[in-house]
Amino acid sequence: MSAVNTPAGFTDFKVADISLAAWGRRETIIAESEMPALMGLRRKYLAEQPLKGAKILGCIHMTIQTAVLIETLVALGAEVRWSSCNIFSTQDQAAASIAAAGIPVFAWKGETEEEYEWCLEQTILKDGQPWDANMILDDGGDLTELLHKKYPAVLDRVHGVTEETTTGVHRLLDMLAKGELKVPAINVNDSVTKSKNDNKYGCRHSLSDAIKRGTDHLLSGKQALVIGYGDVGKGSAQSLRQEGMIVKVTEVDPICAMQACMDGFELVSPFIDGINDGTEASIDKALLGKIDLIVTTTGNVNVCDANMLKALKKRAVVCNIGHFDNEIDTAFMRKNWAWEEVKPQVHKIHRTGAGDFDPQNDDYLILLAEGRLVNLGNATGHPSRIMDGSFANQVLAQIFLFEQKFADLSAEKKAERLTVEVLPKKLDEEVALEMVRGFGGVVTKLTQQQADYIGVTVEGPFKPHAYRY
């Protein structure tokens, strides 16, 4: 697609500035050259049109890389309606380029909470009525939840949902356990080519990029505390170590904690003896009083709480690369401390009380992206080559679920298919192979003797389902 002028009469969109479309198109063309797996799938399945008839409701960060995803879905036959899953993550030139191509999109950087909810609604509605959608592509679960709570009738036609993130998968599993989930779901997050690339290697690239763009600080020689050591935490700790920071890690899972130790990070707790009893007395003030930067990476709630924020070193930087802004107790900060905007998505939080503040006061924290995703709020997120794996998985997951035609099954068959599953390993390997080829790499092929010896086929899959990469 190369259009940069909105089709005549097309008004089914809302973006910050449609005149940014040409800029967005130029960046999208560059991104395509850095997304070999996604573009490989576009070429491979173009003639087959596996998504012909698919009507996809999409809610994922409206970035340049997402523009390539959207246009791949459309090229393979789908119709889509789109919004962003985060109020700060939209790249306005990307949204404009999609609108200019005649694709409904409702997203702009710096939405209010009310505008965010409105954009979600517009994704679902066409001409004021629920669109006859039959697929969902989500990031974080807000769109899926809204459909279940407010538009359940739409779900009668939906074949499934593909979910991008850890947080969204947790919400899906919770809904499934409670008997609330009405459609099957593919857990894209736990595909190896998503979790290792996006969560780990992506954060390794984009965390330090965002912090430096937001603060213009030198990071080397300073102390950082990374909260959580899952894949996002691992990538984040590596990102800060690459900058020369002295990195400490806190964890609740003994296995992840062991990995942090084995990777050479000091494992600490912000709480004395690791016990948070909810009081200031339980805080390790000696530890937090030396921390220059704290990063939350967990997808859990209140992992950087009010008492921790009180104990942090003056002028410490606070940010989140998990998912929602409830990882950091921003509600406490809004209620009790004064906020001074330095520039968009960068605030000085004066710990001298609410209301007025002295601009020369030095007892403040620097909060990035208001506690939301720092890499998308203060920078442009993961690079195209990283998102290539994630979005190739999304395309394959959409094709996989669309072909299953869940909505057309009998009630008995639906009950059997109502699950939250990862993509088959063979498809994960398909994405990985395309990515390797994009790097110019050559994968060695097993001989028949070797394949027989380890009990696999020459074409794969090559590892058992439970293998941990």
Swiss-Prot record:
The keyword Cytoplasm applies. It is an enzyme of class 3 (hydrolase). Keywords: Cytoplasm, Hydrolase, NAD, One-carbon metabolism. Substrate binds at T63, D139, E164, K194, D198. InterPro entries: Adenosylhomocyst_ase-like_sf (IPR042172), Adenosylhomocysteinase-like (IPR000043), Ado_hCys_hydrolase_NAD-bd (IPR015878), NAD(P)-bd_dom_sf (IPR036291), S-Ado-L-homoCys_hydrolase_CS (IPR020082). It is found in: Cytoplasm. One of its GO terms (molecular function) is adenosylhomocysteinase activity. NAD(+) binds at residues 165-167, 199, 228-233, 251, 300, 321-323, 375. GO terms for cellular component: cytosol. Coiled coil: none annotated. Its cofactor is NAD(+). Pathway: Amino-acid biosynthesis; L-homocysteine biosynthesis; L-homocysteine from S-adenosyl-L-homocysteine: step 1/1. Its EC number is 3.13.2.1. Binds 1 NAD(+) per subunit. Its main location: cytoplasm. It catalyses: S-adenosyl-L-homocysteine + H2O = L-homocysteine + adenosine. One of its GO terms (biological process) is one-carbon metabolic process. PANTHER family: ADENOSYLHOMOCYSTEINASE. Belongs to the adenosylhomocysteinase family. May play a key role in the regulation of the intracellular concentration of adenosylhomocysteine. This is Adenosylhomocysteinase. It comes from Pseudomonas putida (strain W619). The gene is ahcY.
